[in-house]
Amino acid sequence: MYILNQEKNCIVKEFISINIYREGVFFNLSAVYNGGEEWLGEYPSYDRAYEVLQDMFKAMSRKEHTYEMP
């Protein structure tokens, strides 16, 4: 799946994992792939970041080709 992050940069590599981490008062999502890590988005709470992560995996299970981060 292709992922468009909040800056609308496209991630075209197969990712190994998606991480949720806290930076200051925000929670960030990042994709880890062979060769690096790409920032996906910033959210005001852990619950919101987790909702987005679940939505992304639902899109993958529907075999959608592109997912745009909210």
Please tell me what each predicted stretch does.
Residues 1-70:
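Eukaryotic intrinsically disordered, low-complexity regulatory linkers and tails enriched in Ser/Thr/Pro
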